[in-house]
């Protein structure tokens, strides 16, 4: 996939990071584009969106990805990770989609204002969200049949609303958020395939695809649980690209 929506006057590029490989690939594509285009010279700001209960493992994964990018693209200006936390307070009796959207929007907007207030008002900021939609219905069905588990709570997230701009409160304006993979209807099945073709296996290995839901009960945040949607999705995707 080619990233083309980078304004030439962009000074600060925010990359929304999670512990999954799709956000790492978005980071890679942006850094590669900047490294190859002399007209672009923004600072890349990795912005980790983390559940407060999983913060340690997510920060560790993001740290590995940032180190990978700095080594791969030494001439690209990559800042330290900026953290946005939200509390894992999803009420199971509410719509999961509504709860998650509310958490991410409210916490993300409020906490982003801290670092936005530290950069000059004449900065040109853009943000890139590397999230993908869940698998297509056909592939979702095949994955569930393969593992014998249903993940209806993730199906409910398909097509959820996305924030397309971020308010910059201290400046009284907004800046755009690009959802490049979602706009191209890419799922992690296609992202994984592109990463393999580019030989980015070690980058994939630096990420973790897991909701870490079981980690709260076991107090083990060091390895995937093996039973959540994201674990099943990655295992099924690997089989498709074997």
Model-derived features: positions:
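Nucleotide-activated chemistry modules centered on ATP-dependent adenylation/adenylyltransferase
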Residues: 1-242
């Amino acid at each position: 996939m080619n990233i083309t929506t980078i304004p030439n006057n962009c000074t600060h590029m925010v990359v929304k990071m999670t512990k999954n490989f799709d956000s790492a690939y978005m980071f890679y594509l942006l850094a590669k584009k900047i490294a190859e285009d002399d007209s672009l010279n923004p600072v890349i700001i990795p912005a980790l969106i983390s559940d407060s209960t999983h913060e340690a493992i997510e920060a560790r994964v993001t740290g590995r990805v940032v180190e990978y990018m700095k080594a791969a693209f030494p001439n690209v200006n990559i800042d330290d990770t900026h953290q946005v936390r939200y509390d894992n307070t999803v009420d199971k009796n509410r719509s999961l989609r509504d709860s998650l959207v509310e958490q991410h929007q409210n916490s993300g907007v409020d906490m982003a204002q801290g670092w936005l207030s530290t950069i000059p008002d004449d900065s040109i900021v853009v943000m890139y969200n590397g999230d993908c939609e869940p698998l297509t219905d056909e592939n979702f069905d095949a994955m569930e049949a393969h593992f014998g588990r249903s993940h209806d709570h993730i199906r409910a997230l398909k097509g959820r609303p996305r924030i397309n701009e971020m308010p910059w409160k201290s400046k009284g304006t907004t800046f755009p958020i690009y959802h490049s993979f979602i706009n191209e209807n890419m799922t992690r099945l296609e992202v994984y395939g592109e990463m393999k073709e580019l030989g980015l296996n070690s980058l994939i290995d630096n990420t973790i695809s897991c909701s870490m839901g079981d980690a709260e009960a076991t107090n083990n945040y060091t390895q995937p649980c093996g039973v959540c949607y994201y674990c099943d999705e990655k295992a099924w995707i690997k089989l498709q690209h074997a």
